[in-house]
């Protein structure tokens, strides 16, 4: 059989196809069953009947038929009996298994009532012509959650609902600074001024990559450059040439420069200073066209800040209550696979966002001086916390017997459609009913925790 498969793969270029690796071993046929191997781990054994296998074999053959070559037949017109005689039906098994396996596996999981939380490792136990196929799947199941107190929790939060006059003034001042204009300054540069410079950096007299810039605008005191650089330009005037001597931090991302002394020959082209508008009614109207006076702006900003502070306070209470409910619970042997999958999901989401901004993974790691491992480590602690939180909230929803009604699902769809400005039908096509139900019961569980919590 192996030589016939090899012959078939050569005829079809089969090595380029992405197929499940099949591991054959002899065993007696079994019905669907589950064998515990360790806490939250076990093996499912299940069968696939011939009435499922035959259509899958037909699909597998039709998929590759157009590429088949054999003497006496035009390409793509080899009859199935000739194919079976020449290569053997067995060479279709891998493709057929890819077709039929997902549904068969899901059916076995459902029949056994298992809550699987990671990708299974599939092995083929028995795969013989004309007989049902028997497979096994090593699976990781959701851990048991022993709930502690989650109602009437008393929490401490480092947040306040109060908004002071200083908070309002600070918001207006930020807007005032945003409206500032840079004007040429005839005199020495001071902290807060912007200088337009050329610079060339060297270490031991040798220029290095990334150490050169032309017409660069640098705000003194902004911390854009390494420590000590900006301070040495204070007092400089347009036309000056300044030798800036600094030492790269030991933690500098470019390892070949970390901890080394460097010299930057710097030419000052311009010194600019901020011209900030007067704090008056005209400024208020420039900031917000819906107000007429500075006092009107203060009233409006106070309301906005109070609303934001209220939301931040409620979020802090909710976060503290959920964190305490999670701490009060016991999760029995949390599988590492759940953490790994959550880390991978977070990393993939982050890198996807970077690529949408035109930053490839290679470029990101080069710019930040980090590695793929660093990024995974960065998300590990948060992933652990997020997985535990989700498990506890799910357990609370189950303990409370929460369900999602049809009207609640419809309301959730409409809310999401409004939030993301898309048709409700599009939301339905993107999210399954099970996903919507899960979100709704999770919200109900969170409400139980937070609505009964109080602040110390």
Curated annotation (Swiss-Prot):
It comes from the Bacteria. InterPro entries: PPIase_dom_sf, PPIase_FKBP_dom, Trig_fac, Trigger_fac_C, Trigger_fac_C_sf, Trigger_fac_ribosome-bd_bac, Trigger_fac_ribosome-bd_sf, Trigger_fact/SurA_dom_sf. One of its GO terms (cellular component) is cytoplasm. Its EC number is 5.2.1.8. It catalyses: [protein]-peptidylproline (omega=180) = [protein]-peptidylproline (omega=0). Keywords: Cell cycle, Cell division, Chaperone, Cytoplasm, Isomerase, Rotamase. GO terms for molecular function: peptidyl-prolyl cis-trans isomerase activity; protein folding chaperone; ribosome binding. Residues 192-277 form the PPIase FKBP-type domain. Involved in protein export. Acts as a chaperone by maintaining the newly synthesized protein in an open conformation. Functions as a peptidyl-prolyl cis-trans isomerase. NCBIfam families: tig. Consists of 3 domains; the N-terminus binds the ribosome, the middle domain has PPIase activity, while the C-terminus has intrinsic chaperone activity on its own. This is Trigger factor. It comes from Streptococcus pyogenes serotype M2 (strain MGAS10270).
């Amino acid at each position: 059989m192996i030589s016939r498969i090899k012959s078939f793969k050569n005829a079809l270029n089969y090595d380029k196809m992405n197929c499940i690796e099949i591991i054959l071993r002899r065993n007696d046929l079994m019905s669907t069953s589950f064998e515990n191997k360790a806490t939250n781990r076990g093996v499912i054994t299940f069968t696939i009947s011939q009435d499922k296998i035959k259509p899958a074999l037909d699909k597998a053959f039709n998929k590759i038929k157009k590429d088949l070559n054999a003497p006496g037949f035009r390409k793509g017109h080899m009859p199935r009996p000739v194919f079976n005689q020449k290569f053997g039906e067995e060479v279709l098994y891998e493709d057929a298994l890819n077709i039929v396996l997902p549904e068969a596996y899901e059916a076995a999981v459902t029949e056994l009532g298992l809550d699987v939380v990671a990708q299974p490792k599939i092995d083929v136990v028995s795969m013989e012509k004309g007989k049902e196929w028997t497979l096994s799947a090593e699976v990781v199941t959701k851990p048991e959650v022993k709930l502690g107190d989650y109602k009437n929790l008393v929490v401490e939060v480092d947040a306040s609902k109060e908004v002071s006059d200083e908070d309002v003034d600070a918001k207006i001042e930020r807007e005032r600074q945003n409206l500032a204009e840079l004007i040429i300054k005839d005199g020495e540069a001071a902290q807060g001024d912007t200088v337009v410079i050329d610079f060339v950096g060297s270490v031991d007299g040798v220029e290095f990559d990334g150490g050169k810039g032309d017409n660069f605008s640098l705000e003194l005191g902004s911390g854009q450059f390494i420590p000590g650089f900006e301070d040495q330009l204070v007092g400089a005037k347009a036309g000056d040439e300044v030798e800036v001597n600094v030492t790269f931090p030991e933690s500098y991302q470019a390892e070949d420069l970390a901890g080394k002394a460097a010299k930057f020959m710097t030419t000052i082209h311009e010194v600019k200073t901020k011209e900030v508008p007067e704090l008056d009614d005209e400024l208020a109207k420039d900031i917000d066209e819906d107000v007429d006076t500075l006092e009107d702006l203060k009233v409006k900003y106070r309301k906005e800040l109070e609303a934001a502070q209220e939301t931040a306070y409620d979020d802090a209470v909710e976060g503290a209550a959920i964190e305490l409910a999670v701490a009060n619970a016991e999760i029995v042997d949390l599988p590492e696979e759940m953490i790994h999958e959550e880390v991978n999901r977070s990393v993939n989401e982050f890198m996807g966002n970077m690529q949408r901004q035109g930053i490839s993974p290679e470029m990101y790691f080069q710019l930040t001086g980090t590695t793929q491992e660093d990024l995974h480590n960065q998300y590990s602690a948060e992933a652990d916390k997020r997985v535990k939180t989700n498990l506890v909230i799910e357990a609370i929803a189950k303990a409370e017997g929460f369900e999602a009604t049809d009207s609640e699902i419809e309301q959730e769809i409409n809310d999401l459609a409004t939030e993301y400005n898309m048709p409700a039908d599009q939301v339905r096509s993107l999210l399954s009913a099970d996903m919507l139900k899960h979100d709704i019961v999770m919200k109900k569980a969170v409400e139980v925790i937070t609505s009964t919590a109080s602040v110390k």
